[in-house]
Amino acid sequence: MIFAAGLGTRLKPYTDHCPKAMVEVAGKPMIAHQLMKLKRAGFTHVVINVHHYAEQIISYVDANQGFGLKVTFSDERGQLLDTGGGIRKALSLFDTTNPVLIHNVDIFSNADLAALYAKHIESGNDASLLVSKRDTSRYFIFDDKDSLMAWKNIQTSEVRTSNNDLRTTLDQVNGDDATYRLRAFSGIHIIAPTLFPLLEKQDEVFSITNFYWQQSSQHAIRGIEAPQGFRWVDAGKPEALAKAGEIVRESYK
């Protein structure tokens, strides 16, 4: 599934008259690069959620015959549902016998999506989150077995966790030690069908990152560390488009 429903506020003025997914990187709309990358990784069916200037995305993908993929649209024009709500709404469009890879339309990386998906299958995780060690203000906290323990904003020191018996300990985590590590989320993750019933029970609008830490004490929600040499950029800001173009030219082949 590709998240493409956002308003693209950070990308103004590019998104004044088009959706973020249609902003060009290296000569093509973001959505084209992501669909082609998923196809090269062996995926055959992609769900795209749409909201802001949705008809532009739908028309473009249809005009290109889905880039050789089966593409289904999850229409959020009536209401933006946030990341978790977007997945929840799209559940009926998924093949519920297989895990679903989720990818933000504005995330560009050299991640090997086929290898990531295979690693998730092998792990038996309920959810696998591609993470890396990079500077940010918001992190996931994992234990030494890669299990998700909490979410933390290091600027405000806010910690969110369902592991309440460890809250005092987790409050003190500000870097890597023998037991815990801070890792940044990449916006690429895989959800197993075991979590679909829980997603269905959530409110209509909710964040998937909140869902993950809320469920982490009861389910196998784990991080998968990006390999050495990992390149990544959030192309949601104008100044990041050039770096996204570099990654496309190097890795989207």
Feature annotation, model-predicted:
Residues 17-32:
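Short catalytic helix/loop segments, enriched in acidic residues and glycine
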Residues 2, 28-104, 115, 202-203:
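Conserved N-terminal catalytic core of the sugar/cofactor nucleotidyltransferase
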Residues 1-16, 39-41:
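N-terminal nucleotide-binding beta1-loop-alpha1 segment
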Residues 123-133:
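A short, conserved acidic/glycine-rich loop-to-beta-strand motif
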Residues 99-101, 108, 114-121, 134-135, ...:
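Catalytic-core segments of class I nucleotidyltransferases/pyrophosphorylases
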Residues 7, 105-107:
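Active-site metal-binding loops of divalent metal-dependent hydrolases
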